[in-house]
Swiss-Prot record:
It comes from Campylobacter lari (strain RM2100 / D67 / ATCC BAA-1060). GO terms for cellular component: small ribosomal subunit. Part of the 30S ribosomal subunit. Contacts proteins S9 and S11. This is Small ribosomal subunit protein uS7. The lineage of its organism: Bacteria, Pseudomonadati, Campylobacterota, Epsilonproteobacteria, Campylobacterales. SUPFAM superfamilies: Ribosomal protein S7 (SSF47973). One of the primary rRNA binding proteins, it binds directly to 16S rRNA where it nucleates assembly of the head domain of the 30S subunit. Is located at the subunit interface close to the decoding center, probably blocks exit of the E-site tRNA. One of its GO terms (biological process) is translation.
Length: 156
């Protein structure tokens, strides 16, 4: 284990929107260090949302999607006297954002549209409208925390 907490590395805002969350999203989307490909996919998805999204801009829908998917509670396994309990815990803001990004990307990859740009645009629109697989994942996480509320006193 570390002697002290690892310093939080600062992320530069993206060049087009000046948004740090988009940079983190692009970095999570990237495979094999191919950042230019990930950037093309991200900006392509935001442009596709601009065309489909009606009066809202792509960046607004992106921000709504991230906010809608952020979980406030999750469960962690805790062993007490031979039994393992799923203990509900609050999620730190940085982890909320990381989980939201991770869930949106993973469920976008599982979608059936042809290109990743289309998949990501559709998943972001669904997430912004509180539907889709990533929103269901958040709801399931809440249900798990709610079902195990009795073990909340085992928090550490």
């Amino acid at each position: 284990m570390r002697r002290r907490k690892a310093p939080v590395r600062e992320v530069l805002p993206d060049p087009i929107y000046g948004n740090k969350v988009i940079t983190k999203f692009i970095n999570s989307l990237m495979y094999d260090g191919k950042k230019s490909t990930a950037t093309t996919i991200m900006y392509g998805a935001l442009e596709a949302i601009d065309k489909k999204g009606g009066e809202k801009k792509g960046i607004e829908i992106f921000n709504d999607a991230i906010e809608n998917i952020k979980p406030l509670l999750e469960v962690k396994s805790r062993r007490v006297g031979g039994a393992t309990y799923q203990v509900p815990v609050e999620v730190r803001p940085a982890r909320q954002q990381a989980l939201a990004i991770r869930w949106i990307i993973s469920f976008a990859r599982k979608r059936s549209e042809r290109t990743m740009i289309e998949k990501l645009a559709a998943e972001l629109l669904d997430a912004a409208n509180s539907k889709g697989a990533s929103f269901k994942k958040k709801e399931d996480t809440y249900k798990m925390a709610e079902a195990n509320k009795a073990f909340a006193h085992y928090r550490w």
